[in-house]
Every structure is written in C-alpha cells, then in structure tokens.
A protein has these predicted regions:
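Intracellular juxtamembrane helix-capping segments at the cytosolic ends
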Residues: 110-124, 332-347
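Conserved MFS/SLC helix-loop-helix module at the cytosolic interface between two early adjacent transmembrane helices
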Residues: 56-95
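Helix-breaking motifs and short loop linkers at transmembrane-helix boundaries and internal kinks
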Residues: 37, 69, 90-95, 314-316, ...
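C-terminal membrane-cytosol helix-exit motif in multi-pass small-molecule transporters
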Residues: 150-162, 176, 186-211
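Extracytoplasmic gate region of multi-pass secondary transporters
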Residues: 25-26, 146-147, 154-155, 222-273
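Central cavity-lining transmembrane alpha-helices of secondary-active solute carriers
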Residues: 45-63, 272-284, 363
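Extracytoplasmic
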Residues: 6-40, 58-61, 116, 146, ...
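Glycine-rich segments within core transmembrane alpha-helices of 12-TM secondary carriers
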Residues: 127-161, 355-368
Length: 374
C-alpha cells in the first residue's frame, strides 16, 4: 500500500469517528435525561449545543484550512474535541455536558470541512468519487454500529458478568455509578488522543483548494444572500438536517414514553436501523439519480418520508418501530440532492455557497430543540 493510500485509510477512520461521535447522542439521550432528571426542554439543549457548533464553525473552518493547511487544521479540530470530552470526564455535570458537546461539535464540524479536499488530494481526482462513496459507507457503518456499542457497553457496566473483563472493571472504577453512559466520553478522550498522535506523525499532501472549495469573501456572501433560491436551498438544508437529527435524537425516547420500549434494547436497535437503512438508501440513490430527474426523486422520497413518519407517530408499537427505522431510508437521498441542486442553481461563488449550506446544519440544533420544547 503506497503512502497516499495510508492517508486515505486514515481519512476513512476520521469519517468513522465523526459519525460515531455525532450519532451516538440519539440513543444516549434517554439515559442522560434519566441520570440528570431533565425535562424534555432541558434535554433539547443537548443536541442544540452540539449542532449549534456546526452552524457557527462551518464557514470559519474553510478559512482555517486556507490559512493553516490540512494537518494543522486536523490537529486543531481533534484538540477541540479532546478538550470537550476530557472536560466532561473530569466534571460530569449537566452544564459541563452542554459545554462538552459544543466543543466536540466545533471539532467535528471542522473535520467535515477539512477532510473533503484532503481526500481529493490524497486519493487523486480519478478516485475521488469512489473514495467519497467509500467514506459514505464507512460513515453509515459507524452510525449503524454506535447504538449497538452503547447498548452492549451499558449491559456490561450495569451487569454482574464483568468481573473478568479488565477494561470494563477499569471503566466502572472511573465512571460515576449513576452515569454509566458517561464512560463513552472517556473512550472518546482516548480516541481523540490517539488521532492527535497519529496525525502529528503523518505527512499530509498540501491541500490546494479549488475555487469551488474556497470560503470566499464577505462580498461573495452578500451577493449570494440577495438571491431567493439561495435562501430557499439554505432553508431546505435546515429542514433536512433538523428532520434527520430530530428523528435520530427523539425516536428512542418517543418509543420509550408511548410504547414502553427499552432505550438500551429495541430503542437502540431502531436508531441503528434508521442509520443502516439511510446508508442503504444513499447507495441506491447513486443508481436512481441516474434514471430519474433529481427534483422528481426528491418529491417522491419526501412523500414517502411523510407517510413513514405519520405511521411511526400514530401506529402500534411494532409498526412504529419499523416505520421509524424506514424513515432513514426515505430521507436518505435528500441532503445530497438538495446540495447538488443548490450548487447547480448558481454559476459562481460555489465555495461560499457551500459554506452557507453547511451553516444550515444548524437545523440539527434548531428542530430537535423545538421538538423537545413541544
């Protein structure tokens, strides 16, 4: 394996970390609520803190990579994530978990912006599309695995069968007995340290941003924001990410409150299959988009998503579980299609427009917060 292929492998590992850390919050949310005795409104501040960071950091991250390059930017991103996770390990309280999630969110937002051009430079233009699909598969696999890892860890930490498991006994020793889920933050801290060490020793190729990847000037943003379609596509990204995270964060708690489903059992499994079916939908979407018009595909999948959600909200237990999971498939193509349609709607300033659209990931903070408030 040549040197650049090792870098591509490292980037895929970073995608795995981003996905696992980002999407573990949903299945963990009922446990956090129970541990801290939170109201749903206070609980809603948890995903709000994390995705608020995405909204704040998306545009500055592009400027940071232009100024400092890929390697330094990666080190900054993982340092922020390390500080966030480490802070909660030391001070496991509700106010600190909000601060921790915000800091980790800043790091994850930076990473997503940095590794796209880095993947292109390391893997080459010819393999870029293939590597992006591979990254999407890795991202989906991590999302699918995270609820199962959480459920398995909770069974070990709260059970009596861990006497011969050194690592579990070690986690029990450093984790507050009433907060077994917080052991994941210790694991995240270790992972972030490992990534910092590895990245510090790796020589990355110089990242030359294309014009459509550069952050752009203030004037570029002003010019874009005067255009009606830019605002509509921005709102579309807010709506999509808000729907995705609203479902992922609240479905387990919904199933627990209205159907008595265990968050560590069927609730976690439902969240896992939500992400798993989303990944399958993304792969099928690569084929379907070649056969039918993107706008038509978006309309069809949107109608299926509305139907799935209605069944999930009002159906009996087993039907609701299946419908919530199927929501992942029905919204799977929306982000990529909306993003592509948006960029194709303008003939210049694509880098600045991408920054505006990525800021719309703030919808992952806004919509779940509204759901919690309701």
């Amino acid at each position: 394996m040549n040197k650049n292929n090792w870098i591509v492998l490292l980037i895929l590992c970073i995608w795995f970390v981003i996905s696992f850390v980002t999407n573990i919050l949903g299945p963990m949310l009922p446990m956090i609520i129970d541990s801290f005795g939170l109201s749903l409104t206070l609980a809603a501040f948890l995903p709000f803190s994390f995705f608020l960071a995405y909204g704040i950091m998306s545009i500055p991250a592009g400027m940071i990579i232009e100024r400092f390059g890929g390697k330094i930017s990666l080190l900054i991103a993982f340092s922020l994530a390390f500080l966030g996770a480490g802070l909660f390990v030391i001070f496991p309280t509700y106010p600190i978990v909000l601060t921790s999630l915000f800091a980790i969110g800043l790091g994850m937002a930076m990473l997503q912006v940095i590794i796209l051009p880095l993947m292109r430079e390391a893997g080459g233009e010819k393999k870029y599309a293939f590597n992006q699909v591979l990254a999407q598969i890795v991202f989906g696999a991590a999302s699918f695995m995270s609820p199962f890892v959480l459920a398995g860890l909770m069974r070990k930490l709260t059970g009596e069968d861990s006497a011969n498991d050194f690592f579990i006994r070690f986690l029990k020793g450093i984790t507050p007995e009433s907060l077994p889920w917080s052991s994941l933050y210790f694991i995240f801290t270790i992972v972030f340290v490992i990534m910092l060490v590895v990245i510090s020793y790796v020589k990355f190729p110089k990242v030359e941003l294309k014009e459509d990847e550069k952050a752009g000037t203030i004037q570029n943003y002003k010019e874009l924001l005067r255009q009606k379609q830019v605002i509509f596509y921005f709102l579309g990204i807010i709506a999509y990410v808000g729907t995705e995270q609203g479902l992922a964060n609240w479905m387990s708690l919904f199933l627990n409150m209205y159907h008595g489903v265990s968050p560590e059992g069927a609730g976690a499994t439902t969240v896992a299959w939500f992400w798993g079916l989303m990944s399958i939908g993304c792969l099928l979407g690569l084929v379907i988009v070649k056969l039918i018009d993107s706008k038509l595909m978006l309309r069809i999948f949107s109608m299926i998503a509305i139907l799935n959600l209605a069944i999930a909200l009002f159906g009996p237990t087993q039907v609701a579980i299946i419908a919530f999971a199927c929501c992942g498939f029905s919204i799977s193509i929306m982000f990529s299609v909306i993003f592509a349609l948006a960029l194709n709607s303008v003939d210049k300033h694509h880098g600045a427009f991408s920054g505006i659209l990525c800021t719309g990931i703030f919808g992952g903070a806004l919509i779940p917060f509204i759901i919690g408030g309701l």
